[in-house]
Each structure stands twice: as C-alpha cells, then as structure tokens.
Amino acid sequence: MRILFLIAFMYGCVHSYVNAVETKCPNLAIVTSSGEFHCSGCVERMPGFSYMYWLANDMKSDEDTKFIEHLGGGIKEDETVRTTDGGITTLRKVLHVTDTNKFAHYRFTCVLITLDGVSKKNIWLK
C-alpha cells in the first residue's frame, strides 16, 4: 500500500510540474539599432538551465549555420546578461555587426534554450 501511495504521490508532483505552461513570459524579441541587434527572452522556471546565443547563415552559399565566434572579424556578440524581477529571469544578448558589407546577405538567429524547449527568432541586415 505504501508503494502505491508513493507512486500516486510522485505522479501527482511530477505530472503537474511537467505540464506547467509559461504564461508570463513573452516570446523572443529583437530590437535593432545602428549595427546592433538586441535579443531578449524570459524564463520562469529554473533559469540556470537556460542559454541564449546567436547563429548566422550566409543565404548566398550552401554553408551550414555557424556560431558567431566562427565568422571572423566584423561581428561579435556580448555575454548574456541575466536580470531577475518577480521570479522571472530575462536573458539579453547583443549582436554587434561592424562590417555590414561582409554580412549583408546573412540571416541572424537568436536562440533561447529553456527547460520548456527552444525559441528562435530570425533577422536580416537587408
């Protein structure tokens, strides 16, 4: 009987946690300014397991999508900044594009990975 109770108790605890829905956090947002892309997204549960990064894909070639640090000069990303307010953690990461000619035909993707899944948002220079 104890085992049955323990199984029922654990199912109730885990089931409600697994099926929780993030409702207070909006989707990813990208704000542009001169040569910069500001990406932000938020996490309600266990933000220490969340990660944000930028990817780039040259739309004029058959190359795979690359991490920003593999593109060489003319582009860089800042460290992810985390702020917490009211139990919600917001992650922000800025992408700086200084060589707009080199990256004119690139698609940039901001990626936020949380325990709830992966969110992506794309943006182009032109």
Swiss-Prot record:
Gene3D superfamilies, sorted: Immunoglobulins
Keyword ATP-binding: no
Pfam family, one: Pox_vIL-18BP
Coiled coil: none
Main location: secreted
Superkingdom as given in the UniProt entry: Viruses
GO cellular component: extracellular region
Compartments in which it is found: Secreted
Secretion signal, residue range per the UniProt entry: 1-16
Keywords: Early protein, Host-virus interaction, Secreted, Signal, Viral immunoevasion
InterPro entries, alphabetized: Ig-like_fold, Orthopox_IL18-bd
Free-text function comment from the UniProt entry: Soluble IL18-binding protein that may modulate the host antiviral response.
Homology family: Belongs to the orthopoxvirus OPG022 family.
UniProt-recorded name of the protein: Interleukin-18-binding protein
Gene that specifies this protein: OPG022
